[in-house]
Design a protein with these regions (language model features):
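Flexible, glycine-rich beta-alpha linker
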Residues: 158-175
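Glycine-rich NAD(P)-binding loop of the Rossmann-fold in SDR/ketoreductase-type enzymes
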Residues: 53, 83-94, 134, 138-139, ...
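Conserved Rossmann-fold NAD(P)-dependent oxidoreductase catalytic core, especially the SDR/UDP-sugar
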Residues: 94-135, 150
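Mid/C-terminal beta-alpha module of Rossmann-like enzyme folds, strongest
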Residues: 215-271, 287, 307-310, 317-328
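N-terminal Rossmann NAD(P)H-binding glycine-rich loop of SDR-like oxidoreductase domains
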Residues: 5-25
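Active-site Tyr-X1-5-Lys
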Residues: 133-158
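Alpha-helical substrate-binding/gating segment
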Residues: 178-187, 197-232, 236-240
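NAD(P)H-binding glycine-rich loop region in Rossmannoid oxidoreductase-like domains
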Residues: 52-89, 98, 115-118
Length: 330
């Protein structure tokens, strides 16, 4: 019998990729999301149009489900602190309660590399101390701790900590970068862009989650591209690919970071304090644990995935700018 997998946040960018990957592997997929689900996949899943904060409806949606992949997350860019806390913490508690009550065999929590903050040394492995430096990282760490609390009571739990996610349809702050490259504007880096910055493709992350489900392996895993490079090299690869007139311009981080923080505080910028803190810093994972445990390997390099993401943006630019393309939720 095919396993039943429920993906929370399945209407979001990563959630939809996870749904597609599980469907292609023959699983019966259920989606729980407050936002409408993809029309192209609607006939292939059972969709629960439910708010993760509604405990009773969440519990009902999880009846008969074997595996839960929890992708729901409220990002701090929304600037709504009450919504941020209720979705990320209370919502996670609700889905964990439902998993426990319905005796689900496996709970997979999608966390974030933001739990590490700005690490003292690289590469970062699963034993590196978690030191989140902003709200999103703290919320993700709180979610991890909740999940591990339920694990101590007998729930089988896996936690994935992905690096910054890219892939077809990935927008958010990348829309700003892609539009600048399209228009030939200068692209700023801090202190020469020598910092090593790692991404992960949504397909590679979804593949890791699928393998974890298939192999029934539990624990914490860092996920990132195996082939990555400096920020300057990544951006150069994008600019050359786009045949853009953009130039990479180095800026003094000690001057620009306070300005970015001020703009974020005044709500004049879509960027959060975390972006200012980390943009000029190195952060990359040691992925030896996930490679060995799940026999996983990344398909995409940093440069390949940012080029692919840019190509998608250009092909869909008109719809995106009209507001009919994929939103920040994506």
């Amino acid at each position: 019998m095919k396993k039943k997998v429920l993906i929370t946040g399945g209407s979001g960018y990563l959630g939809e990729v996870v749904v597609e990957r599980f469907l292609s592997a023959g699983y019966r997929c259920y989606v729980l999301d407050i936002n409408p689900f993809s029309e192209k996949l609607a006939s292939k899943v059972v969709f629960h149009n439910v708010d993760i904060r509604n405990k009773d409806l969440v519990d009902k949606a999880c009846k008969g489900v074997d595996v839960i992949v929890h992708c729901v997350a409220q990002v701090p860019l929304a600037k709504n602190n009450q919504l941020f806390v209720s979705v990320n913490y209370e919502g996670t508690r609700n889905i964990l309660n439902a998993a426990e009550n319905n005796k689900c065999s496996h709970f997979i929590y999608v966390s974030s590399s933001a739990i590490y903050g700005v690490p003292d040394t690289n590469p970062v492995n699963e034993k590196t101390p978690a030191r989140p430096c902003e709200k999103y990282g703290k919320a993700k760490l709180d979610g991890e701790n909740l999940a591990l609390e339920y694990a101590s009571r007998g729930l089988n739990v896996s936690v994935f900590r992905p690096r910054t996610i890219l892939g077809n349809g990935r927008l958010g702050i990348f829309q700003i970068l892609f539009e600048w490259v399209y228009q030939g504007k200068n692209i700023p880096v801090f202190d020469g862009g020598k910092n090593i910055y790692q991404f992960v493709h949504s397909y590679d992350l979804a593949e890791a989650i699928l393998l974890c489900c298939k192999k029934e392996v539990f624990g914490v895993f860092n996920v990132g591209a195996e082939n990555y490079c400096s920020m300057h090299e990544t951006l150069s690869g994008l600019i050359n690919h786009a045949k853009s007139k953009s130039k990479i311009k180095s800026m003094n981080s000690s001057f620009i970071i306070p300005v970015m923080n001020l703009f974020s505080f005044l709500k004049l910028s879509p960027l959060g304090a975390y972006h200012a803190k980390l943009y000029g810093k190195s952060l990359y994972f040691d992925v030896s644990k996930i490679k060995k445990t799940l026999s996983w390997g990344s398909k995409y390099s940093n440069i390949e995935m940012i080029q692919e993401s840019y190509d998608w943006y250009i092909q869909n630019r008109d719809d995106v700018l009209k507001g009919s393309g994929k939103s920040h939720h994506k």
